[in-house]
Amino acid sequence: MIIQVRSAALTYQSADGEVEALRSISLSMNEGEFCSIVGPSGCGKSTLLGAIAGLETLDSGSILVDGEEVRGPSPRIGLMPQRDQLFEWKTIQENVMLGLQVRRRDTPESRRRVAELLERYGLAEFAQKRPGQLSGGMRQRCALIRTLAIEPRILLLDEPFSALDYQTRLAVSADIHAILRREGQTALLVTHDISEAISMSDRIFILSRRPATVKAVRDLRELKDLTPLQRRDHPSFHIHFNAVWKELDIHV
């Protein structure tokens, strides 16, 4: 197992007092898997992702990556947040190099890898452009390449498509899914979009209302060889959707 979350519990202080965010959460992932976390709004999805990233401190329990306990931010873990967080005054190549520079890994070898990633994923001709000259989808691809450049063992994605319009969102999620499959990258996605989770994931972890627990796990490995768009047309897509929706127990 590349990720093991063992009985993770976490509380935090709010203006209204102590809030129990996570209650005895346990889950695991195999290397190369793409999994998603879904749950009701405000249930603690991003809090759990932050704990795995080493940005939140557990009250009890543990999180292991490659058998080593997570005690803070680690170069083994890459995080792609909701916004692309590109610096508008830097070129695309400079933006992609930032993570490596922060880690003091700006070497000829790392620069060659960045050049290869930009070429492989269609951004080489934009390397000297500014982020404002790119489409929303290309900006997200740039943000992904920046994260992949540090060669993380695990990639955490915190609703990275939420700022995109629907059509762009479909195209970019399919694009990023293909890149991660090609790279053999282990990835964990937080999303509020059930369809997005089904179209991209090998498994879905369904969280309960706060305090969050793992209420159910939906196995989608029968769809593993299909692209996100092909999955949306698959006969079982709506079966999976209805099953996840039922587990979420959302009343409208």
Put a short name on every predicted segment.
Residues 53:
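Helix-to-loop junction immediately C-terminal to a conserved catalytic motif
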Residues 38-40:
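The feature captures the beta-strand-to-loop junction immediately N-terminal to the Walker
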Residues 149-153:
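A short, proline-enriched helix->beta-strand linker immediately N-terminal to the Walker B motif
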Residues 61-73:
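Conserved ABC transporter NBD signature motif
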Residues 130-134, 138:
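Conserved ABC ATPase signature
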Residues 93-101, 111, 115:
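Short helical segment in ABC ATPase nucleotide-binding domains corresponding to the A-loop/adjacent helical element
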Residues 155-158:
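Catalytic Walker B motif of ABC-type/P-loop ATPase nucleotide-binding domains
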